[in-house]
């Protein structure tokens, strides 16, 4: 007797660009208990307004990055010179025309997410990340502060549906305190910390695990907000003539391991035990292998290490960390290794790799993997705990 094929997570045919998709949650039962609030732990939002030029003081307007709409995408950079080029701009054109993709139509955003079965979201930036390493550190901080004000306004307009991710000064302690204090006063609950920190004001590469950076971590720890890291900073090491966008997506998670190692082997978590860290959009299947490899590295190189980790490798994960995923059946099969309280479902709206348009299938897969009661935590409870919100 032949067995029937396993149901697929993906709709039949080509899924297509997000701007051409629509939600179908009302037509499908996920198996979640009635009344479950689905909270996507990782979505993205484009800035539609020319916020930096509008909000910079007159004497600095000539240094403000501009934002404009062109050929289906919101671009930014000096006037007419987009910093968003190549595959990055091509990808933006896949979704920026969605009614709710940008900050100028929060009502449409809430509606599109609801049609896809999503009640609430944590919204990360899109093209603004191209400004992460603006060469003028003072202008960079001003950019971040303007963005924080803007995303806080979006959060307010969403009436509890959208929680914005802020940006902070990570290169000096006073700036970290300044931006964290302001970010908290705006009602933001977390911030994005780049995995590649770039250079300090003197042009020296920043080492997150250095003694000099400890004062910045002190400020982050004192603020009490969780740290988020996101894929997307790793670039292919050599060009691809064919399907470069797919190759780039496959290496996106590369930098997680380096930062993960800094937290453990670099002593960051030993010196700052109050930190909480989330890893976003990289899935969860990477976690067991990273833990296993870290245990082997520690056993093999302990005699050479200047800093001796104070705890078992897995305790750092269990105490401080969690991760988000969209479609990760392999990771869900390893849930006992990872921890049911350490994983957070997301739709990643409105990206190409998002489940937007078929999120009900992904949610049902979570229920099938862990059961309805545990699924409630995975699809909403864990991200609310991470952010420290109860509503």
Where do the model's predicted regions map?
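Mid-to-C-terminal alpha-helical segments outside catalytic/metal-binding sites
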Residues: 2-37, 50-120, 149-157, 178-181, ...
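Catalytic pocket-lining loop regions of alpha/beta-barrel enzymes
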Residues: 3-8, 161-162, 168, 178-337, ...
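Alpha-helical scaffold segments that form or flank carboxylate-/histidine-based iron centers
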Residues: 33-41, 138, 168-171, 175, ...
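Divalent metal-dependent hydrolysis catalytic cores, especially in the metallo-beta-lactamase
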Residues: 38, 90-99, 111-134, 161-167, ...
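Active-site metal-binding loops of divalent metal-dependent hydrolases
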Residues: 43-44, 348-349
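Residue-level preference for long, well-ordered alpha-helices that form the structural scaffold
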Residues: 102, 136, 140-147, 172, ...
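Active-site loop-helix segments enriched in His/Asp/Glu that coordinate
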Residues: 115-117, 128-160, 173-185, 207-210
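Short glycine-enriched loops at secondary-structure junctions
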Residues: 126-127, 170, 231-236, 349-352
């Amino acid at each position: 007797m032949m067995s029937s094929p396993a149901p697929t997570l993906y709709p039949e045919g080509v899924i297509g660009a997000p701007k051409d998709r629509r939600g179908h949650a009302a037509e499908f039962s996920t198996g979640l208990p009635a009344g479950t609030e689905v909270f996507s732990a990782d979505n993205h939002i484009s800035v539609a307004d020319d916020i930096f030029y509008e909000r910079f003081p007159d004497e600095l307007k000539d240094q403000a990055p501009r934002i404009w709409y062109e050929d289906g995408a919101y671009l930014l950079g000096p006037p007419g010179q987009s910093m968003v080029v190549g595959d990055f701009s091509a990808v933006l054109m896949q979704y920026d025309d969605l009614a709710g993709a940008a900050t100028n139509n929060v009502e449409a955003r809430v509606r599109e997410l609801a049609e896809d079965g999503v009640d609430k979201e944590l919204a990360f930036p899109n093209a603004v990340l191209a400004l992460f390493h603006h060469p003028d550190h003072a202008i960079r901080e001003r950019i971040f502060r303007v963005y924080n004000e803007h995303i806080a306004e979006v959060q307010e307009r969403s009436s509890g549906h959208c929680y914005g991710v802020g940006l902070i000064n990570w290169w000096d302690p006073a700036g970290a305190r300044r931006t964290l204090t302001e970010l908290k006063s705006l009602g933001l609950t977390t911030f994005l910390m780049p995995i590649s920190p770039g250079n300090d004001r003197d042009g020296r590469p920043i080492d997150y695990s250095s003694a000099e950076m400890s004062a910045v971590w002190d400020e982050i720890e004192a603020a009490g907000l969780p740290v988020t890291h996101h894929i997307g900073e790793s670039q292919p090491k050599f060009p691809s003539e064919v399907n470069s966008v797919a190759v780039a997506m496959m290496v996106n998670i590369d930098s997680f391991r380096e930062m993960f190692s800094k937290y453990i082997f670099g002593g960051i978590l030993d010196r700052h035990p109050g930190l909480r860290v989330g890893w976003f959009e990289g899935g969860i299947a990477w976690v067991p292998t990273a833990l296993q490899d870290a245990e082997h590295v520690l056993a093999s190189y302990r005699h050479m290490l200047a800093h001796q980790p104070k705890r078992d490798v897995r305790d750092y994960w269990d105490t401080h960390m969690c991760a988000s995923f969209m479609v990760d059946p392999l990771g869900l099969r390893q849930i006992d290794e990872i921890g049911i309280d350490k994983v957070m479902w997301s739709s990643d709206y409105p990206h190409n790799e998002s489940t937007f348009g078929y999120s009900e299938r992904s949610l049902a897969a979570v229920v099938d993997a862990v059961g309805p009661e545990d699924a409630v935590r995975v699809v909403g409870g864990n991200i609310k705990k991470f952010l420290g919100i109860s509503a």
